[in-house]
Amino acid sequence: MVDAAFDSDEAIRRWDLHARQIVAYMDPEEGDPHRIVLLNPALFELLPDVNGKRVLDAGCGEGYLCRKLAKLGALVTGVDYSREQLAIAGERTRDRAALGIRYLHGNCEHLDVLDDGSFDIVVSNMVLMDLSDHRAALEGFYRLLVGGGILVFSIAHPCFAAPVHGWVRNENGAKLYWMTDHYFEEGAYEQSVPADSEVGLILFHRTLSNYVRTLLQTGFVLLDVVEPKQAEEMLEPYPRFRDDLRMSHFIVFKVQKP
């Protein structure tokens, strides 16, 4: 259940604690299987042409998305609050000078180190639900974008990642259906990730309407929404994702600063 004692600093402390273990499962160029199968196709469906554009990867983690964007010609700045993740990003970006990627340490809730209107595009991949103050982050992204600039961000789908959720199974262990409960109980809760750890990562649960209303109140114009669905051709190399056709783990928004 939710715990008011958790904040962004505690969330990042846990990311630092588990960074090496989590990143071990991530391909340096494509990310983990969920990103490969679901998130990357959705993000790049919504992103405009990034060639020659100033792009902020807000919450860049180990930097795989920075590297993908830079190879498409983007001028990339990656920001993350986890110093351990940034250290890994530096290790994995061997050709950083050629790619022109700039990695900075910073909290996405307070990006004062970056100038107003300094980016054409902001992308934030699975970050906002890790922050205690998503409104501050969205207001910061709005400030950093030029007029007409685009924000594309993904989050754990609030409807299916409520404080209580998971597969309900029969006596033989077969999956019957995905259950969610306490959807309207907003706040932080501890996840069972990594699975073998006594100290899990923290997710700040908010309703879907909370996210949408905050976007509109910040001044963004909603352009598109995608609930990523795995392509049939991805099920052969990743058969475990077939059950995920029964619900949506993620939701991806495309919004614009007028």
How would you describe each model-predicted region?
Residues R135-I150:
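A short glycine-rich, Lys/Arg-flanked "PGG" loop and its adjoining helix->strand segment in the class I
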Residues M1-N51, Y64, K68, Q85-I88, I150-E190, ...:
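Conserved class I S-adenosyl-L-methionine
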Residues L56-A58, E62-H110:
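Class I SAM-dependent methyltransferase SAM/SAH-binding core
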Residues I202-V225:
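Short alpha-helix
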Residues I121-H134:
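A short SAM/SAH-binding and catalytic strip from SAM-dependent methyltransferases
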Residues E109, V113-I121:
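A short acidic, Gly/Pro-enriched loop at the edge of an enzyme's catalytic core
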Residues T218-F220, Y238-P258:
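Core SAM-dependent methyltransferase catalytic element
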